[in-house]
Amino acid sequence: KGESKSILVIGSGPAGLEATRCLSKRGYEVTLAEKNPFIGGRVTKERLLPGLSAWGRVVDYREGQINKLKNVNIYLESEITKKDILEFDFEHICFATGSIWKRDGVGRVNLHPLEIDSSMNVYTPDDVMGDIKIDGKVVIFDDDHYYMGSVLAEKLVKEGNEVIFVTPASIVSEWSLNTLDQPFIQKRLIELGVQIICNKSISKVESDRVDLLCKYTGNISSLETKNILFVTSRQPIDGLYKSFSEDEIRMHKDIKSIDIIGDANAPAPIAWATYAGYNYAFNLDKKVDEDSLPFKREITDIIN
């Protein structure tokens, strides 16, 4: 433990929970504030998707560890404001407020928002994981290339929707090649009857159709639909963090640092967000040498 005593962690997703767990283990007094009536952030919703129930252990383990500790106070349904933060006497403020999925089509292929007709029903993974029910045919545009597009396709098929899966990659869930899951994912979608369209991106969204752009020929084709689900990229929820100026922090003598971690800093996989929480807690009150590695490499010799 360092010289500080109290830390406020805002957000209880993977990053916030891991930061809370590690900080409390080090001996700090930690207050964890969560705006929802439950902890877990994105994992609480994603664990309910087809095939992802085991991911809930990310939350279950940390919740179990935190509940054993007396130096952690958890406040649910507590949406913290800037005024609240300045009125309390926390020495360190850690924002782990997560991210939301974009609904403008911006991702790896489309670097600018698409032209979208206002009468088209536009959805994001946050909508599908919430209480929104989609009727009829759904076009999923997957420019995320990991697991989310495919599990949402499976969820929608099981709910009775006709699903067309569009991706600019040559295969479904291309990034999943790195985890050896890709062949199983594509096989699963084919068996479910999902129509797969590869090597095409969405260039425009009309009131009753989407225009597809072939990445090789540049030819335009159209798909009739009233529902488009964008699985493209995520936007950090960092408005409260950015509302603090350096002058305000300097004027408030009790605040030693304000940091932002996890998806709120840069949206990434759950494992990275969890590590971000650990890294923040591990280095608090320490002088970090930015020019050196935070670990020692094992150099092996080859013996003939």
Question: Which role does the model predict for each range below?
Answer:
Residues 1-35, 39, 74-86, 96-113, ...:
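Rossmann-like dinucleotide/flavin-binding elements
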Residues 210-214:
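SH3/SH3-like beta-barrel fold
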Residues 41-91, 175-201, 209:
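N-terminal Rossmann-like dinucleotide/flavin-binding domain of flavoprotein oxidoreductases
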